[in-house]
């Protein structure tokens, strides 16, 4: 990087860090986004903080440029945050699995635990190409902790299970976490133990969502809260996930699993699906009165960028959401509970 580019980036990093000062706990144990280059002026770079571990993500750069950029970021941020104990570089555009999952540039091993809203979450920062703990769903974890008391919860596409753990921490009566990967679900089990939660209240199952949903429907199993937070795109022998083209189909697979009066939580992170398109698709599903959009859960400003730090906008307008990660809580009624024009229940 030439001097002008280095000077520009250090200025952007300094400004971003200034606006996140209130999020920097002592001792450091939380998880925050320190810099979102997509929105804050340097698209090849995202910097996250997990307790004392700095995770540097590079995008669309070769190995040499990624390393040079990460070393510059390391030097700049360690001068301001001298308690950082580890720097991990993840090269998202690399063809080498180890480089994508992360190489330690500084310090010892990455942290294995973060705290959020009074809950501990296990980390496995090198398990996958992302960090394994999604910062954009922080608000949803808070909602679950606040609203899941005495509720049964199904967390589909659970990944490392943080949403289900948040529900248990909020007093859920039972949580079922399903994901195709048993390795990812092991992280959920580790989080359960960190919080000394009742292990009998959480069931994990390494199974395809479409298989599990079919089995549950046949058994007439229902849950008070069902969460669908799928990957952007996935194709398995039993089904397809496409967050741009098939949101309605996925919702219709999940809604029979929700109890009458329960909640369906839908997360869509399709970058090129506008907020208006997504909310329009959901509103079309509410026309018969069986579904009601209750809440839109915003993404934290450390992820979206602050008014004073944002330079670039998403490629499509996210409104009425504040980020391409679009989170909606939908109330579900069963057909027998919908009143007819004579104010009688349908039988």
Provide a role label for each language-model segment.
Residues 174-179:
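Conserved SAM-binding motif I beta-strand of class I
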Residues 209-288, 292-295, 320:
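S-adenosylmethionine
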Residues 1-51:
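Non-catalytic accessory regions of SAM-dependent methyltransferases
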Residues 41, 48, 69-134, 142:
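Non-catalytic substrate-recognition/targeting regions of SAM-dependent transferases
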Residues 160-173:
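Conserved SAM-binding loop of SAM-dependent methyltransferases across substrates and taxa
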Residues 263-347:
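C-terminal catalytic and target-recognition region of SAM-dependent MTase-like enzymes
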Residues 181-227:
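S-adenosyl-L-methionine
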Residues 150-159:
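Conserved class I S-adenosyl-L-methionine
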